[in-house]
Amino acid sequence: MRHGKAHRKLGRTSAHRTAMFANMSASLIKHEQIVTTLPKAKELRPFVEKLVTLAKRGDLHARRQAISIVRDVEQVGKLFAAIGPRYKERQGGYIRVLKAGFRYGDNAPLAVIEFVDRDVSAKGKDSGPVYSNDSDD
């Protein structure tokens, strides 16, 4: 029987799941919208909503708790400086999950997970290293 099984395993070990959700939450905080599979998005939502609740508290202990979960100090800084104050008056429901069709190749159900009232200009900003096309060899 399936009593008391609160979360999906997603075919990963416990450590892999923890690391995956830490990385996905850092990406979601950075870009404020990401595309992933529907089961991952549904599991990520409470993970990030707890982080936003910590950011709304805003004290040093909450910041240290968020750093221990996300492990990306820069994104925790953004979480506490921009995202936490944005949702100060909202009592939960900071994340929206929208279905986005099926992935080509394995037909996996996709979803867009994003912050409600997100900053549209944050999407794709600083998404990786920039390589110049200079061929001065």
UniProtKB/Swiss-Prot annotation:
Q: Which GO terms describe its cellular component?
A: cytosolic large ribosomal subunit
SUPFAM superfamilies found in the cross-reference section: Prokaryotic ribosomal protein L17 (SSF64263)
Q: Can you name one GO molecular function term for this protein?
A: structural constituent of ribosome
Keyword Transmembrane carried by entry: no
Listed Pfam families: Ribosomal_L17
Sorted alphabetically, which keywords does the UniProt record give?
A: Ribonucleoprotein, Ribosomal protein
Gene3D superfamilies per record = Ribosomal protein L17 (3.90.1030.10)
- Which biological processes are named by the entry's GO terms? translation
| Protein origin, superkingdom | Bacteria
Query: Known NCBIfam families for this protein?
Result: L17
Q: What is its quaternary makeup?
A: Part of the 50S ribosomal subunit. Contacts protein L32.
The record's comment on protein family reads:
Belongs to the bacterial ribosomal protein bL17 family.
Q: PANTHER family, per this entry?
A: LARGE RIBOSOMAL SUBUNIT PROTEIN BL17M, RIBOSOMAL PROTEIN L17
For this entry, the protein name equals Large ribosomal subunit protein bL17
Classification from the root reads: Bacteria, Pseudomonadati, Pseudomonadota, Alphaproteobacteria, Caulobacterales
